Design a protein with these regions (language model features):
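Domain-level marker for long, solvent-exposed, non-transmembrane regions
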Residues: 21-161
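Sec-dependent bacterial lipoprotein signal peptides
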Residues: 1-21
Length: 161
């Protein structure tokens, strides 16, 4: 009887030790920060929800505009509605590096990319915000003028007609 009691006690102790050694389950949220298609207009422009990060709200929204144009140019828009073109405007491999001086100037603060971004479709309170200790992330609704952007790249001899 004593032997059975000690065996049972040892089994419970072993079970508690093993349960305490399990990895801790952390609760965290993951949010994809890639541009998402919301629709396409009849003029060929694409309405996107784009994310940007910055020190404050203004910086984050400007970065979101740059990210939207960059996604249309180099990555294509895969997430969201299937109306947007999955194919990027520039399909040439390493085009961003090859034409680095052109795109550095194009995407500088206050640069030419702003001519191809419109905030027409932005609705009141449509921004989403996440933050950590050092940066704020905002999403905003942006319309990228894809056909005008394509024409500009053809004129600048980045794309072939």
């Amino acid at each position: 009887m004593k032997y059975l009691f000690y065996t049972w006690k040892l089994g419970c102790l072993l079970l508690l030790i093993l349960a305490g050694c399990s990895s801790k389950k952390s609760v965290s949220s993951y949010h994809s920060f890639e541009s998402e298609c919301l629709g396409v207009e009849l003029d060929g422009s694409e309405t996107l929800r784009a994310w940007g990060r910055g020190k404050n709200r203004t910086d984050a929204i400007e970065q979101a505009k740059k990210n939207a144009v960059r996604d249309v140019l180099f990555k294509g828009v895969v997430a969201g509605s299937r109306e947007c073109s999955v194919r990027p405007l520039i399909t040439e491999v390493n085009a961003q590096e090859r034409y680095a001086s052109y795109f550095n100037d194009f995407f500088r603060d206050g640069g030419e990319y702003l001519k191809y971004v419109s905030m027409e479709d932005k609705k009141t309170n449509s921004n989403m915000k996440t933050s950590n200790k050092t940066q704020i992330s905002y999403s905003t609704t942006v319309r990228v003028l894809r056909s005008q952007l394509q024409q500009k790249l053809i004129e600048d001899k980045i794309l072939k007609p």
